[in-house]
From Swiss-Prot:
Entry similarity comment: Belongs to the cytidylate kinase family. Type 1 subfamily.
InterPro entries, per the entry: Cytidylate_kin, Cytidylate_kinase_dom, P-loop_NTPase
Organism the protein comes from: Shewanella sp. (strain W3-18-1)
Protein name: Cytidylate kinase
Domain of life: Bacteria
Catalytic activity of the protein: CMP + ATP = CDP + ADP; dCMP + ATP = dCDP + ADP
GO cellular component assignments: cytosol
Encoding gene per record: cmk
Length: 230
């Protein structure tokens, strides 16, 4: 890891626009991209590919320490393209099998510690955009610029509904809203790494704002913070 490489953390609840803004910032700045929300799914898929037993903490930990994963800027439907061992697995990691496996591997403390180190290794020149839920509080607490994106539960449910509809899924918006509210409650009150803004984070409420407006606010804050850090 290069401590000199700047890192911008982007935290917040699901549907607040983190993925899209992270992609656009990485493109604009020409920096590396980390989608921490996908990394446990990627590890689970790697375990499945290599026939590693999901109950074997030692083997999963070893796999996590050497996980060959890259995150590239994607497109409108998938803002982040996930590459595992040279293969595009953006769609593969979204299956229910992978989701269930991710929950299993995430339960191991040694696996979580290995993935924490692996995530920090993404901090390389010229810089890193780190998208997640505890990037500014746990993974990169000394990051020079931290953003926290949020939006009303109703707006986030509508965004998720539109996204899934565009992909051909038949979804119920009331159920999506209920799931978002439940997840918010769970994430914000969990004992380890709760979903809260870092004390020095710049909070952007994306409700009613277009992508360009949010991007402009983010870039203005990042430029100010990086200028004062140099």
């Amino acid at each position: 890891m290069s401590e000199r490489a700047p890192v911008v953390t982007i935290d917040g609840p699901s549907g607040a626009g983190k993925g899209t803004i992270s992609q656009l910032l990485a493109q604009h700045l020409g920096w590396q991209l980390l989608d921490s929300g996908a990394i446990y799914r990627v590890l689970a898929l790697a375990a499945i590919h290599h026939d590693v037993e999901l109950e074997n903490e030692e083997s999963i930990t070893l796999l996590a320490a050497h996980l060959d994963v890259k995150f590239l800027t994607g497109n409108d439907k998938d803002p982040v393209q996930v590459i595992l061992e040279g293969e595009d697995v953006t769609t593969d990691i979204r299956t229910q099998e992978c989701s269930n496996a991710a929950s299993k591997v995430a339960a191991f403390p040694r696996v979580r510690e290995a993935l924490l180190r692996r995530q920090r290794a993404f901090r390389t020149a010229p810089g890193l955009i780190a998208d997640g839920r505890d990037m500014g509080t746990v993974v990169f607490p000394t990051a020079p610029a931290k953003l926290y994106l949020t939006a009303s539960a109703e707006e986030r449910a509508q965004r998720r509904y539109n996204q899934l509809q565009d992909k051909g899924f038949d979804v119920n918006i009331e159920r999506l809203l209920s799931e978002i509210i439940e997840r918010d409650e769970r994430d914000m009150n969990r004992p380890v790494a709760p979903l809260v803004p870092a004390e020095d984070a710049f909070v952007i409420d994306t409700s009613g704002k277009g992508i360009d407006e949010v991007l402009e606010l983010a870039l203005k804050h990042i430029n100010e913070k990086l200028s004062s850090a140099n």
